């Protein structure tokens, strides 16, 4: 995602779902003037503050807020040059409303850069995800329920959670409707990361993530 960012010199950035602040630190290292992070987890925000405070030169240049993305309008800061989010938007039910709030927090010509689970992953509802050969090796990824947008009930090591599926077309059209112009998209494949082949060999057949860079070009009514 960092490769999609514009020059950060002197810029003000907001990272939605900042976690422990890894991206915030990278932005400051790239000479951003000020960074703001939001997250749901108090523990992650506490760790983010500890890590950022370790770097004395960052003092006074960052703020952290416990705030869900769905309540972004309540953030007391605005006029950001760049807003980012990593691997989080597929947890949002009302994507158009989130984009409207993001647009309101951005300056004119401000940039939004985000990643999320790829729609060919979020679409899955039931059955096996993989077609396997006689040796039980994964040879093809099954695509199903792609047009059936909405809630997906999922489990990760027996921990239930919810995500929301949107087609690529819906994601793009929602961005356009919110006043954004698409500047770049990326679908990194494992083939481009040979050092991960053994550990993540199941990702050779599909892009796991979708990355989008968009610029605010229309000021809609707030």
PLM segments and residue spans:
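Conserved alpha-helix/loop element of class I SAM-dependent methyltransferases that forms part
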Residues: 1-11, 26
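Class I SAM-dependent methyltransferase SAM/SAH-binding core
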Residues: 14-16, 20-72
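A short acidic, Gly/Pro-enriched loop at the edge of an enzyme's catalytic core
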Residues: 74-83
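Short catalytic micro-motifs in class I SAM-dependent methyltransferases
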Residues: 87-90
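A short glycine-rich, Lys/Arg-flanked "PGG" loop and its adjoining helix->strand segment in the class I
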Residues: 96-111
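Conserved class I S-adenosyl-L-methionine
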Residues: 113-149
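Acceptor-substrate binding/catalytic loop of class I
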Residues: 120-124, 155-169
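Short alpha-helix
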Residues: 162-185
């Amino acid at each position: 995602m960092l490769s999609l960012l514009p020059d950060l010199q002197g810029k003000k950035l907001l990272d939605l779902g900042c976690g422990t602040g890894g991206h915030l630190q990278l932005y400051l290292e790239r000479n951003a003037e000020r960074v703001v992070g939001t997250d749901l987890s108090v523990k992650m925000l506490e760790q983010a503050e500890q890590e950022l405070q370790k770097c004395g030169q960052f003092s006074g240049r960052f703020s952290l807020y416990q705030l869900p993305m769905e309540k972004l309008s309540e953030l007391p800061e605005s006029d950001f040059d760049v807003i980012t989010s990593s691997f989080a938007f597929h947890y949002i039910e009302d994507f158009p409303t989130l984009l409207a709030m993001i647009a309101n927090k951005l300056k004119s010509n401000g940039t939004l850069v985000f990643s999320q689970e790829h729609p060919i992953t979020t679409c899955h509802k039931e059955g096996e995800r993989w077609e396997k050969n006689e040796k039980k090796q994964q040879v093809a990824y099954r695509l199903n329920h792609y047009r059936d947008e909405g809630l997906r009930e999922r489990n990760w090591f027996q921990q239930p959670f919810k995500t929301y599926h949107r087609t690529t077309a819906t994601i793009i059209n929602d961005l356009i409707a919110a006043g954004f112009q698409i500047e770049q998209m990326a679908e990194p494949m494992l083939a481009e990361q040979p050092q991960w082949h053994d550990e993540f060999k199941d990702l050779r057949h599909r892009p796991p993530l979708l990355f989008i860079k968009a610029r605010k070009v229309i000021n809609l009514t707030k």
